[in-house]
């Protein structure tokens, strides 16, 4: 019984998300870059973004050294980022923080459902937020 929550946390859907990260290689020449590091687990994410002429996100690249939760969260960020307005990234990051603090529902971002079991695992909250923090930091460099 003690292993059941862990099995739910690391579902096939969550583990499968990490394989999509190869589609978003980090490019140091992207104009908006940032790195985020977790103090609790040592995970590191380097992220780069480029905006199009209308100010929407046109490109994203990442280098992810994180646990399965961090990798899945990064993949979901990348999958929904192209064409998004920067304010949507910031709003989703804030929504995820609020949700993890028990102050709201999972924010409206495509495919976040596999991350839902992480709510019951506070030790994984930092890894889940890491790619979003990197994206917000990168976008703040373009403000």
Where would I find each of the regions flagged by the language model?
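Short, thiol/selenol-centered motifs that function as redox-active sites or metal-ligating centers
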Residues: 65-71
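A generic structural motif
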Residues: 64, 82-83, 131
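A generic structural signal for alpha-helix starts
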Residues: 68, 84-87
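C-terminal binding/interaction regions
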Residues: 2-23, 87-143
């Amino acid at each position: 019984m003690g292993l059941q929550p862990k099995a739910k946390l690391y579902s096939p859907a969550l583990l499968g998300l990490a394989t999509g990260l190869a589609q978003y290689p980090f490019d140091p020449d992207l104009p908006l870059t940032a790195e985020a590091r977790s103090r609790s687990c040592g995970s590191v994410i380097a992220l780069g973004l480029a905006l199009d002429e209308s100010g929407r996100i046109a490109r994203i690249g990442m280098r992810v050294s994180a646990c399965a939760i961090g990798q899945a969260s990064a993949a979901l960020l990348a999958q929904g980022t192209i064409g998004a307005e920067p304010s949507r990234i910031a709003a989703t990051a804030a929504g995820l923080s609020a949700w993890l603090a028990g102050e709201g529902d999972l924010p409206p971002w495509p495919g976040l459902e596999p991350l839902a079991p992480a709510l019951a695992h506070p030790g994984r909250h930092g890894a889940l937020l890491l790619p979003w923090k990197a994206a917000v930091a990168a976008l703040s460099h373009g403000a």
